[in-house]
């Protein structure tokens, strides 16, 4: 509210999605940036759990009736997203490498692949076109299972210079196992 209320008071009411880039500090969270879009990869772990039709949610946002929508999420499952990046990202990386294995996601309910830095080349083939190439997402009964499935799914995809972090979700798993 501290962001949108002043916008409304200035005669510029906001309709849409605001993503806040935050940093946790010893003095509490601090806002680093605002974006009028979904966060990436944050949306990749939230949207698979959304039970509402996203088009209905968007229309309610546009119509100003979002407060009348009962947003429902699958809170019985966990979701993990692993970003497949081009080696060298965020500094320097090459583009244009063919991406193989995307078809392996077809028909698999707990697995998703979100495109970010991709494009079709002149032959109609999907190739790398950015530093953050794909978001490989999986759901599971808990964080440990979702993480295992997401990392397994990263092996379905290949492209030259593929890079990923191997520690996604580990700190939360360690915390949950120690409590």
Model-identified regions with their sequence ranges:
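Short arginine-rich
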Residues: 4, 152-166
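Short beta-strand elements
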Residues: 20-24, 29-38, 117-118
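Short amphipathic alpha-helices in soluble, non-transmembrane regions
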Residues: 96, 147-153
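Short, well-ordered beta-strand elements within core beta-sheets of diverse protein domains
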Residues: 81-83, 132-140
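Active-site "cap" helix and flanking loop/linker of ATP-utilizing ligase/carboxylase catalytic domains
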Residues: 1-18, 35-110, 121
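Residue-level detector of conserved catalytic or cofactor/ligand-binding positions
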Residues: 171-179
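Short, conserved charged micro-motifs
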Residues: 92, 141-148
